């Protein structure tokens, strides 16, 4: 519970669905989303280019693609509601955009959990300069 409080305090300045996404990540992985995923590999965090470094980084690549398929939505600022049923993330009722953003975030959080065993600390705070390859297409 203490970790949850610390993450919530750290995310107060974050707008929109990034807050919900962070809470989903924490709930699925037990990891602090800011320190564990914000600057991981070539795709976790703002932007992204090159080849995903591992399965976790690929989760971020797919998440970026998912957001890219929502041209009429604002994934980083539109808020949505979700809850848990028997431990599973369930997106709440909302607008079409809110629901699609929630589903993108839900899929990424689950992907992070499924790939916890291959999470590699060498990709935390990974320098962008090492992501030189041409990006894959979504």
Swiss-Prot record:
Its cofactor is Ca(2+). One of its GO terms (molecular function) is phospholipid binding. PROSITE patterns: PA2_ASP, PA2_HIS. The record marks 18-19, 34-35, 39, 46, 76-77, 79, 82, 124-125, 129 as: Putative membrane binding site. Its main location: secreted. One of its GO terms (biological process) is negative regulation of T cell proliferation. Keywords: Blood coagulation cascade inhibiting toxin, Calcium, Disulfide bond, Hemostasis impairing toxin, Host cytoplasm, Hydrolase, Lipid degradation, Lipid metabolism, Metal-binding, Neurotoxin, Presynaptic neurotoxin, Secreted, Signal, Toxin. Monomer. Binds to calmodulin, coagulation factor X (F10), 14-3-3 proteins gamma (YWHAG) and epsilon (YWHAE), and R25, a mitochondrial membrane protein. This is Basic phospholipase A2 ammodytoxin C.
């Amino acid at each position: 519970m203490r970790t949850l409080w610390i993450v919530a305090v750290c995310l107060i300045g974050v707008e929109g669905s990034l807050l919900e996404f962070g809470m989903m990540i924490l709930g699925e992985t037990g990891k602090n989303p800011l320190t564990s995923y914000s600057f991981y590999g070539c795709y976790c965090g703002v932007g992204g280019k090159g080849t995903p470094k591992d399965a976790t980084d690929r989760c971020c690549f797919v998440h970026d693609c998912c957001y890219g398929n929502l041209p009429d939505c604002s994934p980083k600022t539109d808020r949505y509601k979700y809850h848990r049923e028997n431990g599973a993330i369930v997106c709440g009722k909302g607008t079409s955009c809110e629901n699609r953003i929630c589903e993108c975030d839900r899929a990424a959080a689950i992907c992070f959990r499924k790939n916890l065993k291959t999470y590699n600390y060498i990709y935390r705070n990974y320098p962008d300069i090492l992501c030189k390859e041409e990006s894959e297409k979504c």
